[in-house]
């Protein structure tokens, strides 16, 4: 394969949009993604969950967002390689080699949009949890709301995911019980208000005690008080453990494993840029909408800092399409 202008590692929302914008600017671009499906977390973990904080979209599901991004990407020339895990990134004589488990591709610049890395859900921590998960009694994310239709569901967690999923489940489930070990929730204030005004049964401060057949027992924190009710399914929203893998030698990362970026979204390695949840800098906000802007910033920076042997287009779509 001939040398590219840009290789993007990661085909989540930020990576897909970055590829579109790079192509719009006239860069030859390829995206490499380890999963078999593009779209990152919104597509693979919560395709039916509504996302509210993307400009111009009052609400969009993870699946529809991915569909829209792929349609947008189809407007420009690009290569998308799915099911390829990047193992190492090397640089020699100003050219990057992106080495995967299937190939070795070369480019003048690399943009990392790998998100939070490999994700592993935090579990309840009970003895028979794996068996209950295999039986479909315990889940950590939802790919189809139909599985919960007419069911009594208990959601464990106190953040935005637990709150959002409780509201989504209320539309299809028979009963929704939201369980949090603290009295106050960590989610967005507006979402907390919506939950409190809904028919969701909120149990705070309670923790898991026992689950036998369909009987769920909760224990009140710092009190000798238990609750019991019938539950068909448990959804655990305790977040995810991340495993960021350093792909390039001497690449500077922060304590949380994310890549340190300067004001141009460039790492300490010239030509190696980062955007989205994979990046870290002072004042970083881990929001998808912020990641889109970071990707644009990185691509505009590389068009100025690197030498390309062909003319580039301007940064305004109205002058291109």
From Swiss-Prot:
Single annotated GO MF: NADP binding
EC number: 1.18.1.2
Highest taxon of the lineage: Bacteria
Ligand binding (FAD): 33, 41, 46, 86, 119, 277, 318
Annotated Gene3D superfamilies: FAD/NAD(P)-binding domain
InterPro entries the UniProt entry points to: FAD/NAD-bd_sf, FAD/NAD-binding_dom, Fd--NADP_Rdtase_type_2, Ferredoxin-NADP_redctase_2
Catalytic reactions on record: 2 reduced [2Fe-2S]-[ferredoxin] + NADP(+) + H(+) = 2 oxidized [2Fe-2S]-[ferredoxin] + NADPH
Matches recorded under Pfam families: Pyr_redox_2
Alphabetized UniProt keyword annotations: FAD, Flavoprotein, NADP, Oxidoreductase
Cofactor(s) for this UniProt protein: FAD
Cofactor note text: Binds 1 FAD per subunit.
Quaternary organization: Homodimer.
Family: Belongs to the ferredoxin--NADP reductase type 2 family.
Protein name: Ferredoxin--NADP reductase
